[in-house]
Amino acid sequence: MERPELPIGLPEDIEEKKAAARSWFEGLRDTICASFEALEDELEGPLSDQEPGRFVAKDWSRENGAGGGGRMSMMEGRVFEKVGVHTSTVHGEFSPDFRAQIPGAKDDPRFWASGISLIAHPVNPNVPAVHMNTRMVVTSSRWFGGGADLTPVLSRRRTQEDEDSQLFHKAMEIACRNHAVADYDAYKAWCDDYFFLKHRNEARGIGGIFYDWLHSNEDAGGWDADFAFTRDVGRAFSMVYPKIVRSNFNKLWTEADRDEQLIRRGRYVEFNLLYDRGTIFGLKTGGNVESILSSLPPVVRWP
């Protein structure tokens, strides 16, 4: 989708709005981490004789005098081979070559951004990988963006008719349909277009939703309406993905399933390093490299 021209100007209470968004993202992080640790405790199938995983949190600050930082929460366990749930709140100035790409930054390079980002790579190939992020960005304008998408790693499960796909899509649809500022059909199509490996002519997963530059006018509810929708995206994800994990994590798998999982993870690596907007944004704004690249799976294979 082509980037729109957003209105210039910020509300008088923008600092309060920044604080509210940051608080939400950090609270959602804690909720999701607790939920994922509970899944580690509940496992009864393969690998249940191993110790359940626990998140290890590491705070970081931007270097070279740039402002802000974040918390990187990583876990390696018996359900999740690798999962990262990260929050960050950063501010500073965009580099000259990056300003033209960002709404409201052409004439004033200052920015502030806060958000949550999550990628989970489960052990069991029957459990799909998942990605979710939501964020608020402020320049001389302001907007929300984010989304969530599901990546089954087994070809027999990587269909729109699969029960996991149906459950995930329904959760995202409800999150959108409850808000007039959201356009589910457009966000679903945007996700399909965004998470596509052009060099392979194939989708990364089964989709979900993706949105950016959400800046509603006051007649439509303004910032409050955009923030309410963004919160519901996080809530929907935090409820639906654990359901999907529970329905699959006790199933048996074969070596062939594991091989297929590792090959599919290779596609994840290719997308994140070649196309992912969040990865590029983080690296160009002095983000934490370890946190940014933690989205990459722990073990990968290319045929």
UniProtKB/Swiss-Prot annotation:
Substrate binds at residues 117, 133-135, 286-288. It comes from Rhizobium leguminosarum bv. trifolii (strain WSM2304). A divalent metal cation binds at residues 121, 131, 169, 199. Pathway: Porphyrin-containing compound metabolism; protoporphyrin-IX biosynthesis; protoporphyrinogen-IX from coproporphyrinogen-III (O2 route): step 1/1. The active site is at 131 (proton donor). GO terms for cellular component: cytoplasm. Its EC number is 1.3.3.3. One of its GO terms (molecular function) is protein homodimerization activity. It catalyses: coproporphyrinogen III + O2 + 2 H(+) = protoporphyrinogen IX + 2 CO2 + 2 H2O. Homodimer. It comes from the Bacteria. The keyword rRNA-binding does not apply. It holds the Pfam family Coprogen_oxidas. Keywords: Cytoplasm, Heme biosynthesis, Metal-binding, Oxidoreductase, Porphyrin biosynthesis. HAMAP family: Coprogen_oxidas (MF_00333). It is an enzyme of class 1 (oxidoreductase). Belongs to the aerobic coproporphyrinogen-III oxidase family. It is found in: Cytoplasm. This is Oxygen-dependent coproporphyrinogen-III oxidase. Involved in the heme biosynthesis. Catalyzes the aerobic oxidative decarboxylation of propionate groups of rings A and B of coproporphyrinogen-III to yield the vinyl groups in protoporphyrinogen-IX. GO terms for biological process: protoporphyrinogen IX biosynthetic process. InterPro entries: Coprogen_oxidase_aer, Coprogen_oxidase_aer_sf, Coprogen_oxidase_CS. Residues 268-303 are annotated as: Important for dimerization.
